[in-house]
Swiss-Prot record:
The keyword Transferase does not apply. InterPro entries: ATPase_NBD, Chaperone_DnaK, Heat_shock_70_CS, HSP70_C_sf, HSP70_peptide-bd_sf, Hsp_70_fam. The gene is dnaK2. Gene3D superfamilies: 1.20.1270.10, 3.30.420.40, Actin, Chain A, domain 4, Substrate Binding Domain Of DNAk, Chain A, domain 1. This is Chaperone protein dnaK2. Pfam families: HSP70.
Length: 640
């Protein structure tokens, strides 16, 4: 059977591995390196360069050298306006889509096409190593990649001539590599800080089972951002001295970016580094040179906000997994950016233990992808991988509240159902509004789609039973079905990639949910109280109509007055009241009064019925001849 390779398609570097003799092996490229820069360039002669050779000529050819393309893949232009200004090549808006301009060829590329060139090189190098054509692969993506980004990655594989058998999350792949030979159960935290993305996953691993307990992350945080901090520092310092902004010169920007990356790497092992860029620019007075010293302390100061941003997803993942830091057995570092001493110190401070450095952070994801490829090819047995959905899914219910059906970090595939009803009398259709997010109110969450179920027989509100079912398969495709249990009629909607969200929306939802938790809870409680008040009014009116003349005039007047007062306080259809304008203290008091009045009326009706029945039954009761309709009064006490 043909070999299936595992590929880590990274922002900065990529890597390919394969299972050989039951063990994963990283495949060196044609140049002899185990990782390949994710860089593609086109020369003025039209030649295509990929990898190290493309990276080496970037300074001389900045406008035709494409790097960090992973930040653009699967995204609309309005989602990457900030990133578009941080690269030396032109990023164009073509009908809302991202295109990369290549002046050397006089054409524009989609990001998928550039990524495909990197994948094609990895495929060719793997084919030479294995001595056979490679046509199938497992490719990794950040855990927080949305559906369009995942699909774009699959498209890149297709362009490269690969059948992508599976897209798996990078932290999950890393856990496979770490835990392949582990027999004892361990709870591990994978801290994955790469070139352009940051993921945190907590998993239970052991004896072939890899279960994701929680995942969190930031899709706009990585080594590139650390480089950018150095670039800005160098550029601002130079501008202060010379009055020239080097970032406006594409060639100078490329040189600054390379120098920043080199300085960042050096500062992981030394306390200071020299940055020398002769002839960085020129004026009428002659050439200008950049010569500066950067210390590790200054670098950490420049990047303090980025380092702090790494803290939040770790804390969120621990909270979602319902674990304390003491329950984490091992911390596995993934991605080249985890070599930064300040990052390692942060991990140690957050989790109270030294990180496990037994795996190569540049290769571990590709190794994990190769293991998953081995599972799919039948080479690796007894491996069970259980992943999760990153955000809660639900529907909008009365009062604009989001009712969650599948909580975030639920293991997929999964299927869950809830039964809902109508909100008004005689309602013949319901609109199902599918939502994703962590906020209490529907308006604050991501709308995934709406559909309508028609043909519900007219009935009093609360009578029809509408069963709403959420079904997520292993590929992350969400199907929502609404079925009227009375008639059997149903309607459904298929939402491909329920976790598809624009730039940073996932992180924003979680952050806002934390910040606004108290306010959300209070607002939800108010809406629930209002709904309960409306329901109580409806029940009271229904009871009055059903009992008719059995209710005394005084009781009827009292109930009618209480209903009117409660309706006036919460607002009616004709005169709606904003939720914040309602006095909920008075509403609760009126509800209590109305409830007591209903109990009183109910007791009176039963007493009247008993007294009228009691006249005829007392004589027959004395003779001992009990009929079928005899009612026997008995006292009983509840035992606890």
């Amino acid at each position: 059977m043909a070999k299936v390779v595992g590929i880590d398609l990274g922002t900065t570097n990529s890597c390919v591995a394969v299972m050989e003799g039951g063990k994963p092996t990283v495949i060196a490229n044609a140049e002899g390196f185990r990782t390949t820069p994710s860089v593609v360039a086109y020369t003025k002669n039209g030649d295509r360069l990929v990898g190290q050779i493309a990276k080496r000529q970037a300074v001389m050819n900045p406008e035709n050298t494409f790097y960090s393309v992973k930040r653009f893949i699967g995204r609309r232009f309005d989602e990457v306006t900030h990133e578009a200004t941080e690269v030396s090549y032109k990023v164009l808006n073509v009908n809302g889509n991202v295109k990369l301009d290549c002046p050397a060829l006089g054409k524009q590329f989609a990001p998928e096409e550039i990524s495909a060139q990197v994948l094609r090189k990895l495929k060719e190098d793997a084919s030479k190593y294995l001595g056979e054509e490679v046509t199938q692969a497992v490719i990794t993506v950040p855990a927080y990649f949305n559906d369009s980004q995942r699909q774009a990655t699959k498209d890149a594989g297709k362009i490269a001539g690969l059948e992508v058998l599976r897209i798996i999350n990078e932290p999950t792949a890393a856990s496979l590599a770490y835990g392949l030979d582990k027999k004892a159960n361990e709870t591990i935290l994978v801290f994955d800080l790469g070139g352009g993305t940051f993921d945190v996953s907590i998993l239970e691993v052991g004896d072939g089972v890899f279960e994701v307990l929680a995942t969190s992350g930031d899709t706009h945080l990585g080594g590139d951002d650390f480089d950018k901090k150095i670039v800005d520092y160098l550029a601002e310092s130079f501008r202060a001295q010379e009055g020239i902004d080097l970032r406006k010169d594409r060639q100078a920007l490329q040189r600054l970016t390379e120098a920043a990356e080199k300085a960042k790497i050096e500062l992981s092992s030394v306390m200071q580094t020299e940055i020398n860029l002769p002839f960085i620019t020129a004026t009428q007075d002659g050439p200008k040179h950049l010569d500066m010293t950067l210390t590790r302390a200054k670098f950490e100061e420049l990047c303090s906000d980025l380092i702090d941003r790494c803290r939040v997803p770790v804390e969120q993942a621990l909270k979602d997994a319902k674990l304390s830091k003491d329950q984490i057995d091992e911390v596995v570092l993934v991605g080249g950016s985890t070599r930064i001493p300040a990052i390692q110190e942060l991990v140690k401070r957050l989790l109270g233990k030294d990180p496990n450095q037994s795996v190569n952070p540049d290769e571990v994801v590709a190794v994990g992808a190769a293991i998953q490829a081995g599972v799919l090819a039948g080479e690796v047995k007894d491996i069970l991988l259980l992943d999760v959905t990153p955000l809660s899914l639900g529907v909008e219910t009365l009062g604009g509240v989001m009712t969650k059906i599948i909580p975030r970090n639920t293991t997929i595939p999964t299927k869950k159902s809830e039964v809902f009803s109508t909100a008004v009398d005689g309602q013949t259709n319901v609109e199902i509004h599918v939502l994703q997010g962590e906020r209490e109110m529907a308006a604050d969450n991501k709308s995934l789609g709406t559909f309508r179920l028609d043909g519900i027989p007219p009935a009093p509100r609360g009578v029809p039973q509408i069963e709403v079912t959420f079904d997520i398969d292993a590929n992350g495709i969400l199907n929502v079905t609404a079925r009227d249990k009375g008639t059997g009629k149903q309607q459904s909607i298929s939402i491909t990639g329920a976790s598809t969200l624009p730039k940073e929306e996932v992180e924003r939802m979680v952050r806002e949910a934390e910040m606004n938790a108290a306010a959300d809870k209070a607002k939800r409680e108010k809406i629930e109280t209002k709904n309960q008040a409306e329901q109580l009014c409806y029940q009271a009116e229904k009871q009055l109509n059903e009992l008719g003349d059995k209710v005394s005039t005084s009781d009827k007047d009292r109930l009618t007055s209480l209903i009117a007062n409660l309706r006036s306080e919460i607002g009616t259809e004709a005169e709606k009241k904003p939720i914040d304008a309602i006095d909920f203290g008075r509403v609760k008091s009126l509800m209590q009064d109305l409830q007591q009045a209903l109990y009183s009326v109910g007791s009176s009706v039963y007493q009247s019925a008993q007294s009228s029945d009691g006249t005829g039954s007392s004589s027959s009761g004395g003779s001992g001849s009990g009929g079928d309709d005899e009612v026997i009064d008995a006292e009983f006490s509840e035992t606890k």
